[in-house]
């Protein structure tokens, strides 16, 4: 499969299998990672369930991020001009109003070949890539976007044991902000937003290895968000802060309802969450139970 013309709009449905396709110079495509159509339907159903527990104007966003090895195939092989997921429209056709699947590969494609969107030193995306995804999500809601360069940065270095590495942008929040680990609605120890002397990806949210964390942003927007996801959320959350009074984070890999006063639906109501963002790596993506059964279990137990 994968004979679709690269001229077709990114996000439109290919005649072949659902998946991530590499774009070839001759206009053909090669399937790199397929996605189960059945799983797309399962995930869509769960996302619609999340919409059902939010306020009437609440929004749900879902996105899965390729890891660095996919970027390496697209960029370093010299064989391709980009990538795209061919099922974004089909996925969104299954979603209720206010629920959105935003294809990270499609958002990032215009920047993929010549901007640092993934670290070489490990498998994560960079803050710039996370920013581009938030930019698209805000545009979807008609919200003005804070430019990437409006933030001040400490430019650090991030190198692995093989000596591969990249500069690393460690942003300073626009307003004084702070985080706290939350346990059953009670504020616990501080949770750093950026650890400026940490030369690894865990500089963002100090790795974020907590069940539930609340970040108070200093902004007065009248809205609060919950970000559910794995380690790819830690570079994402700092750029979400200007749009919410509070940004909460729940990690489905560690979630424990006994520590958090119930399933996710209880703290959603307790904290007055308006919008939910589900950000997962491809490893925990559509074909993974994390994106369907685990997310549903988080909501209902």
Tell where the protein language model's regions lie, with residue ranges.
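Extracellular glycan-modifying ectodomains
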Residues: 1-301
């Amino acid at each position: 499969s994968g004979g679709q013309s690269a001229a077709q709009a990114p996000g439109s449905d290919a005649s072949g299998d659902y998946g991530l396709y590499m774009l070839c110079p001759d206009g053909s495509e090669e399937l790199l990672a397929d996605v189960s159509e059945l799983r797309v339907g399962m995930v869509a159903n769960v996302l619609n369930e999340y919409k059902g527990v939010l306020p009437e104007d609440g929004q749900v966003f879902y996105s899965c991020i390729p890891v660095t090895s996919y970027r390496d195939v697209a960029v370093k092989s010299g064989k391709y001009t980009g990538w795209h997921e061919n099922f974004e429209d089909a996925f969104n056709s299954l979603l209720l109003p206010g629920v959105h699947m935003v294809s990270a590969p499609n958002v990032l494609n215009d920047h993929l070949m010549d901007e640092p969107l993934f670290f070489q030193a490990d498998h994560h995306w960079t803050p710039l890539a996370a920013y581009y995804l938030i930019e698209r999500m805000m545009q979807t809601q008609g919200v003005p976007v804070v430019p990437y360069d409006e933030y001040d940065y400490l430019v650090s270095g991030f190198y692995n044991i093989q000596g591969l590495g990249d500069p690393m942008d460690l942003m300073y929040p626009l307003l004084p902000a702070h985080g706290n680990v939350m346990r059953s609605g009670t504020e616990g120890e501080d949770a750093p937003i950026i650890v400026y002397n940490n030369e690894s990806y865990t500089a963002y949210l100090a790795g974020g290895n907590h069940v539930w964390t609340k970040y108070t942003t200093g902004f007065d927007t009248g809205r609060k968000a919950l970000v559910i996801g794995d380690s790819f959320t830690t570079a994402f959350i700092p750029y979400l802060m200007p749009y919410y009074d509070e940004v909460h984070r729940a990690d489905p890999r560690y979630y424990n309802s006994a520590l958090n006063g119930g399933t996710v639906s209880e703290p959603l109501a307790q904290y007055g969450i308006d919008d939910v963002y589900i950000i997962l790596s491809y490893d925990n993506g559509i074909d993974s139970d994390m994106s369907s059964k685990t997310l549903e279990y988080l909501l209902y137990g």
